[in-house]
């Protein structure tokens, strides 16, 4: 069930989250922050506009509230949109800290602002179990459940934007959720970029270390997160790939929204891989692999890449990049490969 323009339930906790989120977002001088679909009508045509959106999906009679965050420039969207991008977050944080990070003096770290200014209609979500979306069910919110969220969110976005397809970018376990969703709903996906992806986990030092704590994570639906854990994302593979002020802003943004996150994707990536089948992914695909990223071996990714059926596919190695590419020093490289992929023209001749 898809509910158009659904508002967040008026619980005390949800109202507090909404007030905090609105206040934090308003600090960005470069962004006009408003609520609801009326924002586009009153905003300056050259300014990035922000909107909250909500939809609901049903799981065995239980309504699941899903939060979405949209950024775009109305004038560009109305006249010459380059398409709609849905950004999908990973295991340890919700959507906005990853894709709409506000760093003082460094506006480039808001990926959504960057692509909105290029003429894209950009969206991200909080998967069930994260931040503003529902957390009430007693499950660990695994990768398959995240793909269910994407089915509901994509239907809402396509109906709202009156588009037939959207583009996807998934980071880390977000890439697995995005790929699984694209396997299930190929008709909704125009192109898909999989960053910090892993297929079987063979040869992954990160997952080898993670398996040492699988007993702990298998026994609970949530795990705590703190500043040290977030900082370790930028040091575990190759220290120095990210600036300290960006890492600190990232940690601040995450911890203002959540103090714990689901264990499901950690469990899946540790002991349940593979969860994706490359033969079923029909859309054009770009695999993005940071030079220093320890989440997957080159062999594992190349084996997956070889089995992708669409000839429109890319395997990109990003030099000087580790796991969290959108928050690192070589961000311009990441943007360059994404811009090229998302704006690639359709082939005139296909044989």
What do the PLM-derived regions correspond to, one by one?
Residues 294-300:
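Conserved alpha/beta-hydrolase "acid-adjacent" motif
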């Amino acid at each position: 069930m898809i509910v158009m323009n659904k508002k967040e339930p008026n619980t005390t906790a949800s109202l507090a989250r909404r007030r905090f989120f609105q206040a934090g977002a308003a600090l960005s001088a470069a962004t006009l922050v408003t609520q609801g679909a009326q924002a586009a009508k009153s905003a300056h045509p050259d300014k990035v506009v922000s909107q909250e959106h909500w939809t609901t999906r049903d799981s065995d009679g239980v309504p699941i509230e899903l939060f979405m965050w949209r950024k775009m420039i109305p004038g560009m969207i109305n006249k010459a949109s380059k398409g709609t991008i849905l950004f999908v977050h990973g295991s340890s944080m919700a959507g906005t800290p990853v894709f709409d990070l506000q760093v003082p003096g460094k506006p480039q770290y808001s990926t959504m602002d960057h692509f909105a200014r290029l003429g894209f209609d950009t969206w991200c979500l909080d998967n069930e179990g994260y931040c503003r979306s529902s957390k009430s069910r007693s499950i660990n919110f695994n990768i398959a459940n995240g793909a269910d969220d994407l089915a509901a969110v994509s239907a809402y976005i396509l109906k709202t934007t009156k588009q037939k397809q959207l583009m996807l970018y998934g980071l880390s376990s977000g890439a697995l959720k995005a790929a699984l969703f694209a396997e299930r709903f190929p008709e909704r996906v125009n192109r898909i970029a999989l960053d910090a992806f892993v297929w079987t986990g063979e040869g992954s030092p990160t997952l080898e270390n993670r398996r040492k704590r699988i007993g702990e994570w298998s026994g609970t639906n949530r795990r705590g997160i703190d500043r040290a854990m977030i900082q370790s994302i930028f040091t575990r593979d190759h220290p120095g790939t990210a600036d300290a002020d960006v890492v600190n802003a990232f940690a601040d943004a995450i911890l203002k929204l959540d103090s714990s996150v689901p264990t499901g994707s950690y469990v899946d990536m540790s002991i349940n891989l593979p969860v994706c089948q490359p033969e079923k992914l029909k859309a054009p695909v770009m695999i993005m692999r940071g030079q220093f990223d320890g989440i997957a071996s080159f062999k594992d990714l190349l084996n997956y890449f070889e089995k992708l059926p669409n000839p429109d596919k890319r395997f990109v190695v990003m030099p000087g990049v580790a796991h969290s590419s959108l928050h690192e020093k070589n961000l311009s490289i990441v943007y360059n490969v994404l811009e090229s992929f998302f704006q690639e023209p359709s082939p005139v001749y296909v044989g």
